[in-house]
């Protein structure tokens, strides 16, 4: 220890628990300083030594060389600590030049630009003046009245030079005091008496009623409280002393050729010093006021440029017209200190190289080029060479390694044995982007990678590169082996499914191997022994595809071996031989042609029942088998494999006839252009699908034997059906028809590409398809960045979400049920509850047996019990309802998807959630590119069919029978349920208004029976009574217009937005129904039969005609459809997580009640909901052009939509509560990903939602010091209330608020984390004023200060510390 001390190498890092940020007082700045910088000079151009008292002065900042003073009088260690009397430099290590600061005594006070210009301006808020006014004072434009004295001037009033002169003439020189510059602002700030000011503001807040004033007062009061609590003085925001950064942190480097490169900061400091010195001289020489003032303003500008260049006025630029990088720029953005150096560091002991496939590797191995290994493991090789006495010193060892002596290679072999290395492929989108492997030394220069881990790395071998990192310490090696080894990462943390799954060629080989053909040689033979079969195969008595019988030994449930005779093939038996013996893994799982899905299922089963080791061995053997048969099968494909179905021409002719009919209807004015466009696109979508289906049938036909008795099966079909290569979409384009293409704006071009790639495209078709292809390319380029940004925001908001305890013992939970859309179960209940915990005891509904106890994990066996019990909804615990004070508890989170067991404490689930949501986003943007712009839109849903044999139940049934004896739905929220024999809901569908109902309440229906149908492209307006039509408020050219179609010349009446009518009355176009006497007909609900028409409605009837019940009197055309792809989806995901108001958002009803249309107001319609209990109704003002989905007299439930569109998330929270908000966000986000076939567990989305719901807004301050309208952390709020109750005070009330992820990240408790995310200057300004303390609880802030993260293995370390 003493030796270490002697050499002064003792680490001087301090142990600390928290970090506090404050405004530095002038005294503090002086105490940091080692001397004042007086001269702007840097170094002497001849001697290259630093100038005395300059910016690099050795006397102030320390010696340039270790233990050597500047003049050279004292050299070496022995003189340590002596200060040279000649040059004044202390003899010490030169490292102090990175630590010692200097200072500049300013000749005039200067405002700190962050407190002046960072919005909201703190100085102007405190002084209750506008920022513009403060600037005028600081930059010497206007004077401010400090003391009005005997004059009638106001305190704080601004005066120009002329006005000041006039006032002096009027009141006399000494009647009042007015001043200018930073001195006066400093004086005004000094005079503020915070306790009194706080009291005054508080009283004013109580007495004011104006909302704007309240907001302003709350802002000011908050700032005053911050200053009081932090003990900062407001006058410190104006600086008298400027700190100077250590010179090594703003270096001056000599370039070749004698020129110097310098940090911009030196230039900025020089300007400050120059101006400061000039100002001192001017003041000493008693220069005229105007010159001094100008110099002070220039000094202010110089200091502004140093702190934040470009924030105010023109940025200071260098000779090349580039703005200087100021102190703020050093912190800000991707290249700033936080993100470039603190969160992302370069790593030593690493290398990178191209990857090639290594099919003979085991799953835990990678091939490392010898050259790389030799370089990376150098320290280990040196120590071993010395240990074995092969080399006497490190130097000798070094020479041996450089000479690549034979013994070095032997030592290298030993060194790398069981020493894992980390492989990383950029971009690392989720944690499986870095995995550990045991290296095998190989010749060549490329890293060999195991094929099965490619999916996790998203790697392919078309030139991808990977980086290798060496864990050095024993702890790092241990963690790499236990947590990061590829064999320990079999399941994906996003959805709990295996990610180590055979893919591409392996799948193809296994599919080929497990095919069974009819009429093969030796069909029906029986075998009891594999060697016997091999013999038969070798002598060509059978083939690998021959259907045979085989006696196979199998484990039964008791674990006894029983022989079973199976109908199988030799190929399938080869796979069967690899299966681990377990009663749960039956032979039937592989006794079929194995597709990618089947293989994934088998691997999952093996993992669940046999454990990790068995899975790894099984996957490795499968891979080898797959590769072998992919090779020997000789599968390839040529032109003839692309079969063009004969029915193609028929389908196309039919569709073209159909389209002619639509054209005719359009010409006759029966449908609008938009409807025609939609119908045409639908027709072509259906045609493309039919052609594609016929093509698939054709290529899937059982193969015919040829002369050599070798059966052929279509290669393309094999590749697609097995999931090895190519999608249905791509094959459709090869042999069917390319179909519809999208324009660059997402619109579908209504003329499809009829040809396919085999037939070849015409020039016109080629031109049309180029459009879509380019869109794919451009999307990929643009959307990757936005997806990466979404991931970054998600990580930032959730980074401090860590499992901190086993159980928070809450009784709360959320109820989940399967998601059913269009009568189809999209997500079964089982999928939603697997790996979650029960919130209550769950019993069998019939036998009343206990299935699950509260807090028990729902695993696969429990799932079977729940399914057999027929439960359709279950209460589960969720992170949303977890009541842990910090972090989240394991029970509320449930299963760790990557291991399949209960999550362990210290798991960083927030980051995992963010990666699971963000990673597919990036993948999906790149996926458009492979289909080449073909439109991926199916035909619109225009009917609903029964998905089961079941009994019909109709909710909100309101039906009229029209003149054609058809049942027409009149309800806006009609739902059709299908019930099984026990009355459990099997499916449910929403039936839109105006649909024809083909069944009724209580009917028994069979599977595929049509239940209802409707026109998907228009929203009809339908009559409930028969009568005569009367048009009201339809004034030609003002509220209704005859639109003559250019193409057809047929006029139709369309409602237009009515401008203010000349008579001053608002027009509300409507149709009324009259009876025979000419009086308005009354409806059953007691209201008049009148139908309001929204803007854009097309009339279907003429004035004065007689109509029947159920007739359509007007249609509202729906907008033409655009393709739904992830590009539409990613912005939607971002919109949801940012909690933005959707464009054209819906309005939702806040109460149950009846709808009434009130008097319109300007361009708004008034909708009133009257509650059933007769209390005060609620009013909604909606823009006139919007389509109102309710009619007068309709009964709406809380949460029903009044206007079409996506609801605003904040509204859902306010009206429906947290649980429904969460389920809405989860459903919407999942819908986007589901469209692309990506599976993400709900709990990941719930973690993010929990982070969005961290803040509450105070509605009533009670007896606490909280202010109404203040937004604070939920936990903080609970703590304050607990204190208040203890002290016998009334607790405060607050409501939960939803914040977007960006806002949540910026308002996190840790200012270090927030500053490193975005808006660095604003965050730090705020934190400094409030004297914030960072407790270092999250991951990011710990990485920044260089400590172990408090998660994973660092979690316990952090707790013990």
Curated annotation (Swiss-Prot):
Cofactor(s) essential for the protein: Mg(2+); Zn(2+)
Molecular function terms, GO-annotated: DNA binding; DNA-directed RNA polymerase activity; magnesium ion binding; zinc ion binding
- Residues annotated for Mg(2+) binding in this entry: 460, 462, 464
Sorted alphabetically, the Gene Ontology cellular component annotations on this record are:
DNA-directed RNA polymerase complex
What does the record's cofactor remark say about binding? Binds 1 Mg(2+) ion per subunit.
Is Zinc there in the keyword field?
Answer: yes
Which EC numbers does the record give?
A: 2.7.7.6
Q: Where does Zn(2+) 2 bind?
A: 808, 882, 889, 892
This chain belongs to the protein called DNA-directed RNA polymerase subunit beta'
